[in-house]
Amino acid sequence: MFKLALTLTLCLAGSLSLAQHNPHWWGNRNTIVHLFEWKWSDIAQECENFLGPRGFAGVQVSPVNENIISAGRPWWERYQPISYKLTTRSGNEEEFGDMVRRCNDVGVRIYVDVLLNHMSGDFDGVAVGTAGTEAEPGKKSFPGVPYSAQDFHPTCEITDWNDRFQVQQCELVGLKDLDQSSDWVRSKPIEFLDHLIELGVAGFRVDAAKHMASEDLEYIYSSLSNLNIDHGFPHNARPFIFQEVIDHGHETVSRDEYKDLGAVTEFRFSEEIGNAFRGNNALKWLQSWGTGWGFLPSGQALTFVDNHDNQRDAGAVLNYKSPKQYKMATAFHLAYPYGISRVMSSFAFDDHDTPPPQDAQERIISPEFDEDGACVNGWICEHRWRQIYAMVGFKNAVRDTEITGWWDNGDNQISFCRGNKGFLAINNNLYDLSQDLNTCLPQGTYCDVISGSLIDGSCTGKSVTVNEHGYGYIHIGSDDFDGVLALHVDAKV
């Protein structure tokens, strides 16, 4: 009887973790966008006016719970919580709930960035949060939850990243480290996450997951409610979980400890794709991209070119400030069938602490758009760049097809097909790509969705004529604005 009970328990745990890898996308949609620091009302409008019509699958939103108010309002104050009240500079609970429903109604799922590891770091005296709650972080006193000193690990600093105890029980950059082995501490985030599920979210990005023991997270995840069927989710659907675990391949706390609980952020993807498109690694080697590079299995990997943290760091990671390479890398990311894809939507920054666009009263301002739909008032909105949203459409069009017809010039010019539905070519050399290449597409003329759009049967950019054998003449000049060309069956002239 004991063996039977144990078997049933293990099967249930396995099925729950497997379910937590499902992002619950509509139809053939399969790209998430991180609308970093956007207001809830603006996200609702963006779902209805742009993301839904353009085929985006979901939005990762900034933390929703009350945070400390820091001088100058740097972006990272959102990662210093003092309660679980749903009031931030992005809006209140009513506005959040309205946004979730409106986005779900147009097939765009919402994933919340959640902070389970810690509360706010030290603050001189009494801190007041975005909902008006008072706390004394220096005393580990957070009455808005409530948490007190006994709910936290003893104060210590992480000085050795190869020491598991320090990584998981000391304070990450001074943030007060919660003791998730405590039943009381576990109960509060479970209540918080369940409330968000009730409001209709599809899942969670778990910040600083590697700083929490995997067994504690497993308990929290398995205790959560199923998704809300009133928002279009099937019965018994589990929240999609993706966890921030920075693992460069030599970490004491490994991504492998978390991959069965949900997806894991594959930071090596970001670093290596940046290396390649910065010219530090030949593109020809990308033929084996994915697990061939030591990355996680595709269904367990949350993939990205950059995120809100590493786009601010020096190094190989690409960001909007290198637009040609960034667009090429993003095109490859969305065209190659590996991982659960997320694209970044940033605001302009000059230094690490730059706040989101705000007015004189330090209120976040809404994005404004020019006649082409691009953002103009401090918001970068990479997701509105044609070269990126067009690749979201490409990814939708070629879903469930494999890589075929790989070609390269032995260096930094590559092309490949996605079944007989799509074709991508990239030129990262300092000379032109001019070649008859196998596109694998049915005979006809196709619009290059990178350089233009198919409007009323006409292409506003380059077009490629494919012959009866699937071949077409591909030209990407070394000085072309984008360095990439993309064709697919939904853009046939």
Curated annotation (Swiss-Prot):
- Mention one GO biological process in which this protein takes part, according to its record: carbohydrate metabolic process
Organism placement in taxonomy: Eukaryota, Metazoa, Ecdysozoa, Arthropoda, Hexapoda
What is the name of the protein in this document?
Answer: Alpha-amylase-related protein
> Quaternary state and partners of this protein?
Monomer.
Disulfide bond residue pairs:
C47-C103, C156-C170, C375-C381, C417-C440, C447-C459
Q: What is its EC number?
A: 3.2.1.1
Renumbered to this chain, the signal peptide range is 1-19
Q: Which residues bind chloride?
A: R205, N307, R342
Identify the gene encoding this protein.
Amyrel
Subcellular location(s) of the protein: Secreted
Q: Which PANTHER family match?
A: ALPHA-AMYLASE (PTHR43447)
Main location (coarse class): secreted
- What keywords sit in the KW lines? Calcium, Carbohydrate metabolism, Chloride, Disulfide bond, Glycosidase, Hydrolase, Metal-binding, Pyrrolidone carboxylic acid, Secreted, Signal
Gene Ontology cellular component terms for the protein in this record: extracellular region
Kindly list the residues the record flags as site (Transition state stabilizer).
Answer: D309
- List the catalytic residues: D207 (nucleophile), E244 (proton donor)
Can you tell me which family this protein belongs to?
A: Belongs to the glycosyl hydrolase 13 family.
**Impact of altering T401A?**
In strain: SA3
Q: Which reaction does it catalyse?
A: Endohydrolysis of (1->4)-alpha-D-glucosidic linkages in polysaccharides containing three or more (1->4)-alpha-linked D-glucose units
- In which organism is this protein found? Drosophila yakuba (Fruit fly)
Would I find Metal-binding among this entry's keywords?
Answer: yes
